[in-house]
Amino acid sequence: MGVELAFPKVVGKQVYGSLYDCDENVLKDTKRLEQIIKEAADVGNMNILDIKSWKIGEGVSVVAIILESHITIHTWPEYKFATVDVYSCGPHTSPLKAFNYIVEKLGAKKYTINEADRSSEF
């Protein structure tokens, strides 16, 4: 008779999309974008470890490393466009709530949303 091993389930929830007709002043503002990510992490019950940002032309890229994975915002103010990715491996988190918060704060008038279940069972 063999021994059956039970391994924990790995949770992976990803929400990402493209945001159109955003507030171009927010899209240019590195400090404001960093604050939005901090607030979104709170809304999604995530724990920020570090935030890095880079100004690229008029746009900004902000990457937050969270204990559970990451949150990113990349902006193109000249097109009033941004992309957002919220990925979490924490069963206690809500990437969807964090994503929706970012959409609201960037003032997107239109957006796409994609959800991926990246969980795996061993």
Swiss-Prot record:
Catalytic activity annotation: S-adenosyl-L-methionine + H(+) = S-adenosyl 3-(methylsulfanyl)propylamine + CO2
Involved pathway(s): Amine and polyamine biosynthesis; S-adenosylmethioninamine biosynthesis; S-adenosylmethioninamine from S-adenosyl-L-methionine: step 1/1
Residues the record marks as active site: 69 (schiff-base intermediate with substrate), 74 (proton acceptor), 89 (proton donor)
Pyruvic acid (Ser) sites (modified residues): 69
Cystine pairings recorded for this chain: none
Recorded GO MF terms: adenosylmethionine decarboxylase activity
Post-translational modification summary for this protein: Is synthesized initially as an inactive proenzyme. Formation of the active enzyme involves a self-maturation process in which the active site pyruvoyl group is generated from an internal serine residue via an autocatalytic post-translational modification. Two non-identical subunits are generated from the proenzyme in this reaction, and the pyruvate is formed at the N-terminus of the alpha chain, which is derived from the carboxyl end of the proenzyme.
Matching Gene3D superfamilies: S-adenosylmethionine decarboxylase
Keyword terms, alphabetized: Autocatalytic cleavage, Decarboxylase, Lyase, Polyamine biosynthesis, Pyruvate, S-adenosyl-L-methionine, Schiff base, Spermidine biosynthesis, Zymogen
Domain of life: Archaea
Site positions per UniProt: Cleavage (non-hydrolytic): 68-69
Entry note: cofactor: Binds 1 pyruvoyl group covalently per subunit.
EC number: 4.1.1.50
GO cellular component: cytosol
Named cofactor requirement(s): pyruvate
GO term, biological process aspect, one: spermidine biosynthetic process
Family matches, as InterPro entries: AdoMetDC_fam_prok (IPR003826), S-AdoMet_deCO2ase_core (IPR016067), S-AdoMet_deCOase_pro-enz (IPR017716)
Summary of the function given for this chain in its UniProt record: Catalyzes the decarboxylation of S-adenosylmethionine to S-adenosylmethioninamine (dcAdoMet), the propylamine donor required for the synthesis of the polyamines spermine and spermidine from the diamine putrescine.
Subunit annotation: Heterotetramer of two alpha and two beta chains arranged as a dimer of alpha/beta heterodimers.
Cross-referenced PANTHER family: S-ADENOSYLMETHIONINE DECARBOXYLASE PROENZYME
Family: Belongs to the prokaryotic AdoMetDC family. Type 1 subfamily.
Protein's name in the database: S-adenosylmethionine decarboxylase proenzyme
Source species: Saccharolobus islandicus (strain L.S.2.15 / Lassen #1) (Sulfolobus islandicus)
